[in-house]
Amino acid sequence: MESGFSGGGGGSDFYGGGGGRSIPGGPGTVINVGNNNPQTTYRNQIPGIFFDQIGNRVAGGNGFSGKRTLADFQAAQQHQQQQQQQPFYSQAALNAFLSRSVKPRNYQNFQSPSPMIDLTSVNDMSLFGGSGSSQRYGLPVPRSQTQQQQSDYGLFGGIRMGIGSGINNYPTLTGVPCIEPVQNRVHESENMLNSLRELEKQLLDDDDESGGDDDVSVITNSNSDWIQNLVTPNPNPNPVLSFSPSSSSSSSSPSTASTTTSVCSRQTVMEIATAIAEGKTEIATEILARVSQTPNLERNSEEKLVDFMVAALRSRIASPVTELYGKEHLISTQLLYELSPCFKLGFEAANLAILDAADNNDGGMMIPHVIDFDIGEGGQYVNLLRTLSTRRNGKSQSQNSPVVKITAVANNVYGCLVDDGGEERLKAVGDLLSQLGDRLGISVSFNVVTSLRLGDLNRESLGCDPDETLAVNLAFKLYRVPDESVCTENPRDELLRRVKGLKPRVVTLVEQEMNSNTAPFLGRVSESCACYGALLESVESTVPSTNSDRAKVEEGIGRKLVNAVACEGIDRIERCEVFGKWRMRMSMAGFELMPLSEKIAESMKSRGNRVHPGFTVKEDNGGVCFGWMGRALTVASAWR
């Protein structure tokens, strides 16, 4: 077929014509054709006359006759494509393997200094529908140029022709027209790219924590990129997570955590307690190892509370301590009763209830015979004698001097005597009260009963007259007596029944408002934090730090807390109850609540406000509650 040009042409020499030239394919259309002679160059094409020849070509034109058959051409194309893909996948796999330890940094508008294969050309198909080859035949094409080139291509009958601005940027295979892939094959190329990226993420354990759908990945980055990241690490790496209880979130602290932290909070305490309650001793021990207890005299009440709680939890894991019977603890307990208004006002409320039960006649005031099961250092009765003296001074001095008779029962727990100084100490207390009574013009009769077992408790064993008026004081006594949760004998209820058999006119009960007896371990920890935390804060706010007794009181509170949290069974002495449970227990023993008079409540309120505005006094179901900042710490009540 004549082409109209010198030098031969036409369809017969499409693959092997003598020289590269433009062949007219129709009105106003040309197709670029090269031959197999590398020395022959393309002729300069006339701008503005490029048209689509395929649209005007007659279908079924198979009259080409070349040096190679179609099958040979397709086989050559497939072989060349395999050779191009093999180094690409080898390079991609190498990049993925070498990038496992360091995740490359992604930069916007990054241009790789070392070229790589453009993935969009891997799956391109030729005009002949075979296992197609790339239009660029494996040459490196920057992504920006590829996108610009694709935007310049036109679509004709579903086939994109290689005409436009990017057609001559790179040499093409001689003898083959530069034809772009079919349009629907572009989606397959994108799918393959996405698949490779997913494979990359799986190999690198990439969870997209850097955020965003970043197109610049390990595959599209060059070797020099991740090598640069190895040489120059990220100046702001992810900091090590610091230890925190609350929390198990993935947020990190601004500074690197050390192996031991001096910061501990109530939340940390609850985390340790939860681990212990769930039997995860190793986890609890690990957390405790991170918490330091650096002695600091300037620590506030909250920090001291946490220190006590940590010591209690450590003791819970190791060997519990039982040091509540020592002389040091007895002294600290008495100091607590004297320095803390919540305890001191509770004793005073009990004294007022005892004085209200006295008989008034022409011969003078007849104070009931007081039976005390835990007199301590006698501080409560020092205040009782002074209050009685104040009342007496307000009346006619013609009356006879009042007589106060007190019987102190040696301290016993679970039916056994406790070595707290015994009879000698109690006699010393009696001597002190007698001397004070003499100065105040009050006659004091003080008796001591020792070696008395619970089953032998009666009027006769106490030295009481059959028709004598009695008052039994149980202030801060019952919480230390075991109940049915400790032993089947239930000494707590047995003591109440024995006291009921004495037929007293009044029974005074003062106890801490705290649920630490039968509460589960976690409940005890939470309750101890709330109760003893408020108590420590009240001591800190009312007792000057220069007072040497303050440290002793705080240490005593710490021992009480440790016993309540760390010990179980008979070793746990601190078994406080809330007022509601005491009401039920007293009612079951046959007692009836005697609401404290409004006069007593108002007197306690005025005294509490004079000490510190943070102390609160309120009536609650017949009892008077004393607390700190709204938290009830002690409750006083009277029974008959």
From Swiss-Prot:
Any one GO molecular-function label of the UniProt entry: DNA-binding transcription factor activity
Region (PFYRE): 470-563
Name by which UniProt lists this protein: Scarecrow-like protein 8
Location of the region described as SAW in the Swiss-Prot/TrEMBL record: 566-640
Disordered as annotated region, ranges: 1-39, 227-263
Family under the similarity heading: Belongs to the GRAS family.
Subcellular location: Nucleus
GO terms for cellular component: cytoplasm; nucleus
UniProt tissue specificity: Expressed in seedlings, roots, leaves and siliques.
Stretches with biased composition (Low complexity): 242-262
Region entry VHIID, spans: 333-408
Region (Leucine repeat I (LRI)): 263-317
InterPro entries referenced in this protein's UniProt entry, alphabetically: TF_GRAS
Sequence motif VHIID, residues: 368-372
Residue ranges with Gly residues bias: 1-28
Organism: Arabidopsis thaliana (Mouse-ear cress)
Function: Probable transcription factor involved in plant development.
GO terms of biological process kind: regulation of DNA-templated transcription
Domain GRAS: 256-640
Spans annotated as Leucine repeat II (LRII): 428-460
Keywords: Nucleus, Transcription, Transcription regulation
